[in-house]
């Protein structure tokens, strides 16, 4: 019953108020909500792991590993499916992150991304210090011409943090993800 009331409350706040929605804070059993995926699903040899940690009163996910390009590979990611609907007027995603001074991506899948290789992506660079990065939905690029040019926030199905596209060591901590 509490779960249902929480769900209804989130929908109400998101739909009526149009305020910030906490997508993830890595406090309440994140290991049950996040999936670690590598290019091994398609024959690649990238490897890594996700850990859920706590340090200095911060709970966060740490994704680490090696991105390799052999066998048409080139990614590792953590992904979470949405269990609520985002307000169509939401404009951006905000993440609190730190890492190894490398470029990473957010991949968004919507009800229109039918094939496994379809997504919308935006890049960001992390530093070794915690920082907040804002990514406007209008700046996400579609992975192919078969997709609509723009993301309709109410159709978002999942959000992923991705190390992608070049050989490198991945090391990124994600403390919070907010949609607003």
Regions found by a protein language model. Name each.
Residues 1-9:
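Sec-dependent signal peptide recognition
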Residues 2, 16-180:
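Beta-rich carbohydrate-recognition modules and glycan-binding surfaces
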Residues 9-17:
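Hydrophobic h-region of N-terminal signal peptides that target proteins for export
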């Amino acid at each position: 019953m509490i779960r249902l009331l929480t769900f209804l409350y989130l929908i109400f706040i998101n739909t009526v108020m149009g305020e910030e929605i906490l997508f993830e804070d890595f406090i309440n059993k994140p290991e049950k909500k996040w999936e670690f995926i590598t290019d091994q699903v398609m024959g690649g040899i990238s490897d890594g792991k996700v850990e859920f940690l706590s340090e200095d009163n911060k709970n966060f996910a740490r994704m680490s590993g090696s991105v390799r390009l052999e066998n048409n590979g080139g990614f590792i990611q953590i992904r979470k499916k949405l269990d609520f609907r985002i307000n169509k007027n939401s404009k951006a995603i905000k993440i609190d992150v730190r890492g190894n001074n490398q470029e990473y991506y957010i991949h968004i899948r919507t009800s229109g991304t039918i094939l496994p290789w379809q997504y919308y992506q935006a890049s960001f660079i992390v530093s070794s210090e915690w920082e907040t990065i804002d990514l406007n939905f209008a700046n996400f690029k579609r992975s192919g011409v078969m997709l609509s040019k723009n993301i309709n926030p109410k159709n978002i199905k999942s959000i992923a943090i991705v190390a992608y596209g070049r050989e490198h060591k991945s090391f990124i901590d994600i403390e919070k993800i907010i949609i607003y």
